[in-house]
């Protein structure tokens, strides 16, 4: 089976083609970072308009990259949620229309299932069961995964997601959008131990997260005096260490609770090198394994949607002719494969 995947949930337009036998045949991505930079964040209407202009050309580019014709595609997958409703509608409408015109099935893909399955694109994919840490700008969740669509929510953020806290703290430090990766780079120059940030909710039982207080702590620290580059770097390092430690503590609890030996990290924040190193060391000490996608597949992309769509189509899933998207869509509502 050969599937075309379309991702337009937020500020990246992604199109990819995945073949069941040959793997990833094409991967095209257009980022709207420059479009939204002057606003310090994503402007939904601008995002939707840009997807309208970029989606079809990227589909043409993906087909050309793979050396394929429309008749070589066996299915179309598109992100149907969660995300920005206008942006989602662009990809869903194009995807559904193409599937109808080409006479192939279409499937609506859950954006976070795409992220969760992105490590499956690597040479050493994780086997079930595993604990998944979904950590991005919009989500921070721990999921017990025993199969495709067999997802149990163990805990999630009660306020800001970790990625959102990264971006907002970066803005406090005067960094440009998107701030998370820039904060991580600045943190590498920071002196460890100069500032001590709290590890929120780690002294509470359970697996819930909270990052709004950490963001406030960072804001107060900056206001107290962070005018020079080194001080800002020290604040960035203290903040990053607090987030990484918090995520690691909660992951350890989730692994203890489930007794699983595999941890999967997915979503944009999973590209953070400090987080990867800390989780890798933790799993080494536990005698387990940690899995994550290459950095370009941690952020939004069409490859994860094409792969997730292929898995769902093989399991019998298929979208109706009606175009429908879900800006809010709990991952645990997805059916198990073949159900």
UniProtKB/Swiss-Prot annotation:
> What GO MF annotations does this protein's record show?
iron ion binding; N(6)-L-threonylcarbamoyladenine synthase activity
Name the cystine pairs. Answer: none
Instruction: Provide the cofactor list for this protein.
Output: Fe(2+)
Q: Which residues bind substrate?
A: 134-138, 167, 180, 272
Q: What is the catalytic activity of this protein? A: L-threonylcarbamoyladenylate + adenosine(37) in tRNA = N(6)-L-threonylcarbamoyladenosine(37) in tRNA + AMP + H(+)
What does the entry's cofactor note say about binding and number? Binds 1 Fe(2+) ion per subunit.
Sorted keywords for this record are: Acyltransferase, Cytoplasm, Iron, Metal-binding, Transferase, tRNA processing
The Swiss-Prot or TrEMBL record describes its family as follows:
Belongs to the KAE1 / TsaD family.
Specify the protein name: tRNA N6-adenosine threonylcarbamoyltransferase
| InterPro entries per UniProt | ATPase_NBD, Gcp-like_dom, KAE1/TsaD, Peptidase_M22_CS, TsaD
Q: Could you state one GO biological process linked to this protein?
A: tRNA threonylcarbamoyladenosine modification
**Does Iron count among this protein's keywords?**
yes
Protein EC: 2.3.1.234
Mind telling me which SUPFAM superfamilies this protein's record contains? Actin-like ATPase domain
Q: Which organism is it from?
A: Sodalis glossinidius (strain morsitans)
Binding-site positions, Fe cation: 111, 115, 300
Its job: Required for the formation of a threonylcarbamoyl group on adenosine at position 37 (t(6)A37) in tRNAs that read codons beginning with adenine. Is involved in the transfer of the threonylcarbamoyl moiety of threonylcarbamoyl-AMP (TC-AMP) to the N6 group of A37, together with TsaE and TsaB. TsaD likely plays a direct catalytic role in this reaction.
Q: Domain of life of the organism in this record?
A: Bacteria
Checking Pfam families in the record gives: TsaD (PF00814)
Entry keyword annotation includes tRNA processing: yes
């Amino acid at each position: 089976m050969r599937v075309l995947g379309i991702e337009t949930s937020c500020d990246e337009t992604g199109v990819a083609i995945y073949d069941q036998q040959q793997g990833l045949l094409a991967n095209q991505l257009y980022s709207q970072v420059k479009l939204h930079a002057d606003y310090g964040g994503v402007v939904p209407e601008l995002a939707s308009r840009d997807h309208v202009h970029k989606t079809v050309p990227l589909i043409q580019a993906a087909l050309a990259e793979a050396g394929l014709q429309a008749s070589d595609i066996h299915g179309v997958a598109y992100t149907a949620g969660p995300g920005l409703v206008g942006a989602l509608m662009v990809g869903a409408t194009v995807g559904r229309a193409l599937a109808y015109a080409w006479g192939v099935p279409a499937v609506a893909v859950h954006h976070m299932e795409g992220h969760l399955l992105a490590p499956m694109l690597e040479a050493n994919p994780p086997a079930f069961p595993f604990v998944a840490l979904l950590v991005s700008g919009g989500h921070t969740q721990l999921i017990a995964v025993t199969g495709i669509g067999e997802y149990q929510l163990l805990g999630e953020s009660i306020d800001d997601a970790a990625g959102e806290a990264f971006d907002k703290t970066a803005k406090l430090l005067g960094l440009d959008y998107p701030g998370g990766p820039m904060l991580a780079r600045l943190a590498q120059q920071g002196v460890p131990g100069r500032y001590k940030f709290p590890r929120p909710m780690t002294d509470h039982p359970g697996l819930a997260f909270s990052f709004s207080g950490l963001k406030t702590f960072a804001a107060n620290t900056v206001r107290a005096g962070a005018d020079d580059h080194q001080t800002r770097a020290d604040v960035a390092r203290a903040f990053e260490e607090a987030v990484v430690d918090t995520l690691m503590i909660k992951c350890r609890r989730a692994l203890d609770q489930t007794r699983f030996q595999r941890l999967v990290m997915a979503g944009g924040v999973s590209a953070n090198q400090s987080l990867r190193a800390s989780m890798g060391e933790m799993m080494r000490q536990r005698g387990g394994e940690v899995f994550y996608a290459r950095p370009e597949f941690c952020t939004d992309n069409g490859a994860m949607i094409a792969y997730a769509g292929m898995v769902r189509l093989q399991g019998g899933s298929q979208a109706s002719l009606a175009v429908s998207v879900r800006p809010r869509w709990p991952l645990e509502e997805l059916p198990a494969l073949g159900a």
